[in-house]
Amino acid sequence: MKKFFMMLMAAALTTPALADESKVKSWNSYDSMGCMMLRECTKDVRQAKTWMSFGEQHEANKDEITDILTSLNQIGVNVYIGDDKYFAFNTRGLYYVNGNDMFFNEKYISSPTMLIKVLRHEGWHTAQDCMAGTLDNTFTAIILQPKEIPDWIKDGAKRTYPPSASPYESEAMYAAFSDTMTRDALKVCASPKRMWEVYKPTPLTKKWLMEQGFISK
């Protein structure tokens, strides 16, 4: 995920300030996705404020969706649904760590199973952002101990993502299969508690938190 965002930001930052969609060089690219993420392209991008924003077919998951959206709203993360043209090929959703915004591809939200998995996945990345100390940063941190993630999830992440991203993505992939993980983590993020007071940090996460002055030992 780190490498992905570096590529994405490189594409976005090398694009001139985009006043409107006509200046997008190509659709379904990092260029168009960067335009949407930077909120320079807003046509066919709408904000999701309730579970109904995704469609009435998601009623079976409305409680979980509502809990996640409530926590995201409390921590200042805006959620948007954008036209497929903005998203790089096969991108279903993303959390933009620099802007603390979440984006979902309109093309994929009609399926209740797909939507809830993507919401959990990207919501977990938000929780990882929170685990890094504060949302006012451009970093994310590992939350779970390695042994907590099944090997089949880790193997899938290694096959899908570059080595630098797979530890972060394996957690998010695991969370996508749970109806409590993302919901609970975001509730902690939105509470007065610190993430590392609830989730024991890994050695590397602890080292990062100490270096940044969030914990003393």
Question: Where are the language model's segments positioned?
Answer:
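Sec/Tat signal peptide C-region and signal peptidase I cleavage site
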Residues: 15-19
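Catalytic Zn2+-binding segment of zinc metalloproteases
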Residues: 123-140
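Auxiliary, metal-adjacent structural segments of Zn-dependent hydrolase domains
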Residues: 20, 31-98
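Sec-dependent N-terminal signal peptides
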Residues: 4-13
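Stable alpha-helical elements in mature extracytoplasmic
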Residues: 64, 68, 115, 119-122, ...
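Metalloprotease/metallohydrolase-associated module, dominated by Zn2+-dependent proteases
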Residues: 138-217
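A mature extracytoplasmic/lumenal domain signature
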Residues: 83-85, 106-108, 130-133
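Short pre-active-site segment immediately N-terminal to the catalytic Zn-binding motif
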Residues: 102-119
